[in-house]
Amino acid sequence: MDLWQLLLTLALAGSSDAFSGSEPTAAILSRASWSLQSVNPGLKTNSSKEPKFTKCRSPERETFSCHWTDAVHHGSKSLGPIQLFYTRRNIQGQTQEWKECPDYVSAGENSCYFNSSFTSVWIPYCIKLTSNGDTVDGKCFSVDEIVQPDPPIALNWTLLNVSLTGIHADILVRWEAPPNADIQKGWMVLEYELQYKEVNETKWKMMDPILSTSVPVYSLKVDKEYEVLVRSKRRNSRNYGEFSEVLYVTLPQMNQFTCEEDFYFPWLLIIIFGIFGLTVMLFVFLFSKQQRIKMLILPPVPVPKIKGINPDLLKEGKLEEVNAILAIHDSYKPEFHSDDSWVEFIELDIDEPDEKNEGSDTDRLLSSDHQKSHSNLGVKDGDSGRTSCYEPDILETDFNANNIHEGTSEVAQPQRLKGEADLLCLDQKNQNKSPYHDACPATQQPSVIQAEKNKPQPLPTDGAESTHQAAHIQLSNPSSLANIDFYAQVSDITPAGSVVLSPGQKNKAGMSQCDMHLEMVSLCQEDFIMDNAYFCEADAKKCIPVAPHIKVESHIEPSFNQEDIYITTESLTTTAGRPGTTEHIPGSEMPVPDYTSIHIVQSPQGLILNATALPLPGKEFLSSCGYVSTDQLNKIMP
């Protein structure tokens, strides 16, 4: 092996004389070394022990220096002195000749220093290390790429503040830029990085790069010692320079608390207990105010209350007791005359029959028991301007009472009929000079007595209709035409509430009319019974023919109730075919209106009467049905 190495060295040494300069020799040596290793892998050189470049740096971008390591000697042979050669490329890309290092001393041992005369910032450099003419190491670079500023100088710190607990403190660290860096002219722009740690720790805490020469450091523990370092780099570069000298920061203890461990305020524990306490208080409040809150959210439904009635009766379902209480309670009784502020009542003494013709007829008329006609209800009083005090409710009550006792008073019916006849002729008893007073034959009186003995059934209409028929007979008399203005006097009021009117002067007809009317009514009542709704055919035929046999100067016009009264057309046709009584009346004149309906009460002494519709003779039947109304009946009757 040593022989092969010796032969190779001699060959190389001999060939080196044929080249001028050292560059080809170094290249040949390098290629020869690789060739020997490829031929014999076991043959190795000591290239791994040769010197290497460690770094090249420019502190201020105006000068730069390069450093390398020492060579390691193995065996008896040494490499010889180490030399550095450099070259620069021009703009055209041509490489200049190699030149040796200008200064091996200024930058220190194993270094080469290039001052500003040998430094070009924008021109690339290539350097190499040689030993005994052989190239050991080489590299190429530009000055901009190797800029590494010097460490900052003059580091110090200032205490900013201490926390309220005295555990932490804040400081401000200051320094100065490297003196050889042209910062003021802007030839270089530096960025600084600060790192700190506690003395006994190994991990450094780095802060973000800054452009200023001061930076605050927060939350340093009191009574601890810290190490602070600062380094710089050119902006937009990756290569930091060397760290500055270590700055030691010692914060004195400000209070009695020891700073061995951090004191953390138990915020989480306080929040948990606070929420729990608020929840307990809320539940206590809701429990204590449960009823009040329930009433606010769900107000109770008011229970229906009736004055004077125990609500328990309604709950238990005792409706009989509730109805009994409502019936006897004053506040639930029906109130009459609710719309009238005051009501006048005129008392009528009907217990003294001897005094019936005495006193004011108008006072009797204004009593509360005489009104039944519907034309008088609801008419306003001329004096007070209010509605009449004669209400239909009270009158209907009286009429119902009369209808109820009608069946039980059959014994007193003849006396009542006789009393009505007396009332009709009340104003004619004192007419002694009347030519008709003696005209009433004595043979007619037994008929009246016979009618009283037969106990006739109740008439289909009430006492008012009977009185109406009597009054109509009197008005139909031609002799009473001169006295029609005096039919505003009330002779009497029947127990059933009917009003009996009489002329103001003596009637010339005398008692004959009264007797004949009473006899006619007795005959009609003696033959048939009439109800409140209908007339039968047979009864109508019996009652209607009576009129032609009465030989007086007036005719009796049948008057029927206007409500629900019907008779057959066959009976009316038969009756209408017979000769009427008007044919036998000598000197008949125009019929006189029947003033038996009170229109309005002007004063206690004055009445205004309504005239009923006059019968129109010669009317024919217009209806072809089996029944006709009472209006049509009154028009066609003779």
Swiss-Prot record:
Encoding gene per record: GHR
Protein name per the record: Growth hormone receptor
Sites of Phosphoserine modification: S341
Membrane topology: Single-pass type I membrane protein
Role description: Receptor for pituitary gland growth hormone (GH1) involved in regulating postnatal body growth. On ligand binding, couples to the JAK2/STAT5 pathway.
Organism of this sequence: Macaca mulatta
Motif segment (Box 1 motif): 297-305
Region of interest (Disordered), ranges: 353-388
InterPro entries per the UniProt record, alphabetical: FN3_dom, FN3_sf, GHBP, Growth/epo_recpt_lig-bind, Ig-like_fold, Long_hematopoietin_rcpt_CS
Residues modified as Phosphotyrosine: Y487, Y595
Required for JAK2 binding: annotated span: 294-379
Presence of the UniProt keyword Secreted in the record: yes
Subcellular location: Cell membrane
Record GO biological process: cytokine-mediated signaling pathway; endocytosis; growth hormone receptor signaling pathway; positive regulation of cell population proliferation; positive regulation of receptor signaling pathway via JAK-STAT
Secretion signal, residue range per the UniProt entry: 1-18
Subunit structure: On growth hormone (GH) binding, forms homodimers and binds JAK2 via a box 1-containing domain.
Cytoplasmic side: 289-638
Transmembrane segments: 265-288
